[in-house]
Structures are given as C-alpha cells and as structure tokens.
Amino acid sequence: MWYAIEESGDIMSKKKKKAKKKNKILTAFLCLTAWFFGTVLVVLGGFLFLLYLVQLGPSPRIRDLFVASAKESSVGGVMVDLFLSPEQVEEIMANNSTKEFSEITDTTMVKIAYANSESKDSSSQSSIGRLDNPEDPDGDGITVYDVHGPTYRGKMMVVFDPSRVKVGTIDHYGISSPGLTLPDMVEKYDAVAGINGGKYDDEAGIGTGGMPQGIVFSEGVLRMGDPTSNYEVYGFDNNNVLVVGHMSAGYAASIGIRDAVTFGPALIVNGKSARMAGSGSGLNPRTAIGQREDGAVLLLVIEGRQTTSLGASMADLVEIMENYGAVNAANLDGGMSSSMVYNGEEIVSSCTMRNRKIPTAFIVERRD
C-alpha cells in the first residue's frame, strides 16, 4: 500500500515537472512572439514617422527630391501616396520635370571621324581612328572613365567607332517570356561591352523582362512597334549617327534607322540641352546614351540607391553629357536595370541583389 502511494506521488511529481516545462516553453514562445511583433511595429512606426517628416516636414526641397525619386521607381510611388494628395504629387512632379524637344537630330551635324586603324594610308586619318589615339592608349577602340558628383558615381564608356554599337535583343517577346540579364545579353552576341537599353513591361518591379514597350529596331529590322504610331526613338541610322526624337516607326524606317529603342527624355538635341524645371527629376540609378560631333558614342551608367551613390538627376545627366562633348543624347531605362558590362565583367552593377532580366541592350561588338 505504501509503495503504491509513493509510486502515485512520483507520477504526480513527474506530471507537474512536465507541466512546468511546457509552461516555460509556452511563456518563452509568447515572449519571443511579443518581442518580434513589437519590434516590427516600432520599426514600421519609425519608418512611417520618417516618411511623414520627409513629406510634410519643414524642408520642401527634401520633400520634392524624395517624391520625384520615389515616383520614378516601380514600387516607390506607394510611399508617396500615404501622406500627399494626387494634386500635391502632380505639382511636385511638374516642378521637377524635363521639357520635351519638338525637333529631331540633324544628322549633318555629326562627322564620323573614326577610320580603320589598319588602313595603309594612316596619314589621312583622324587620330581617333589610329593606334596612337591619346584617348585610346590600349588601342581597343574603347575608353572607360570614372564619373562622380555630389550624389552619384558611375562610368562613362567612349566607343570611338559608332558602327560597333548595336541593339541586342531577346528572340521572343511576351509578358510571360523571360528576358536576359545584361551579362547574358552581351554573351549572346559575343560582344565586348554593353549597357541596358529601352523601356519594358515591369509591373510592380516583378516583371519577367520579356516584353519591350515602344519601339525596337535591331540590325535594321523593326522588331517592335506599329509603323503608324509615334514613339520616342533613340538609336543609330545606317550612317552610324545617333538619332534622337519623336517620330513614327514608319518614318524611322524611312530614314534608315538600324538600331533603336524607346525611353526618354531626350537630354541634348543638335547641341541644345533640354530645359528643366527644378532638377528635372529625382535621384536614381541612370543609363544614358550620347554621341559626340566626331561620331564617338558615349555610354553612361550611374549607380544609385546606395549609401555611396544616391543617384543622378536629369540635370546631372545633361551636365555629364555636355562635359563629354555630346551633340545628341538621351536617357534610357534606369533604376534597378542600370548596369554596364565590359570584357566579361559587370563594372557598374544594378542596385539589386540579382541582375534584372531585360529585353534590349546597347551592345558593343568586338573588333574583327
């Protein structure tokens, strides 16, 4: 009898210990859950308070810069709409915009100076086409410069022979079709360099990169675009002159456009720089293309949304292109797509953890 009572007591003691252990685990779990959600609420509350201060605080300049930058991104516009009315946002964007050009490129202003450096009669060539070109010490026809300003850093690639610059594109277009990353696009064409290209469908920043928007000419073929519809056309004609302007796809074909995409805005047309309200835009990663009077092509990519490089405005792009002698220049797709590849290396990277898939790119062919 005594043994039975003792055994029963042991069982009860063990049950109590198990219950206490379960209670401790449950208490720890509840505390951890409360801490996690409390931390999330504090962080979220702090973030919303920061957005409130930026958008409704004492500095209109910071507010305008934030709004203009966020509205240019795929998903950032949601943050802007939390505290500002549509009318306020529209006014801010209008006060930081780039005016459209009504004219297109006068191709007679560009005189292609490049000549084949292997020509026997090198005495008749411009220095831009010879091996002793001071801008091209290694003789590969490409020079890359570092560019930087108060809010940005990036690279300017100068390609001395404009006939080497083409539009690379994927084989099939479609909303569900996958695009190619820039390194893969450059590899597809066995090119030596490349930058991202034109506009494409990217709803909420999660698109497949397989559907261009606007116009696409690649190696003389109209791959995308209605011949009767008007587009912003940025690309090269059969004389290797960069053409910048608003025109129909049919007109573009009639003037011999061989490689072109759509984006915008135009930055410089016929030596005239775009007129701007405010800074012309927000600060973001940027990609742009230009051409000098001697025909050399300017490929510019600016890093952004990083602690070391917030990004560039349209006014910054115009200034850079002016400094490098552009007579025509245009803004291309930017943001998370902005990147530059050279000799198999991504020398300017996207601001995301992974490379974006895109349908078009300006690629630089290898020399024969």
Task: Label each region the model flagged.
Residues 160-163, 235-241, 269-270, 291-295, ...:
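Short acidic-glycine loop/turn motifs at beta-strand connectors
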Residues 193-197, 244, 269, 328-334:
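General beta-strand structural signal in soluble alpha/beta enzymes
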Residues 200-279:
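Active-site-adjacent helix-turn-beta-strand microarchitecture at beta-sheet edges
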Residues 152-154, 188-190, 229-231, 262, ...:
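Extracytoplasmic
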Residues 206-227, 277-327, 332, 337-368:
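Conserved, well-ordered active-site substructure
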Residues 3-225:
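Zymogen propeptides
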Residues 170-177, 248-252, 302-306:
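Short, solvent-exposed aromatic-acidic interface loops
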Residues 154-158, 233, 266, 288, ...:
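Conserved hydrophobic/aromatic beta-strand scaffold that supports enzyme active sites
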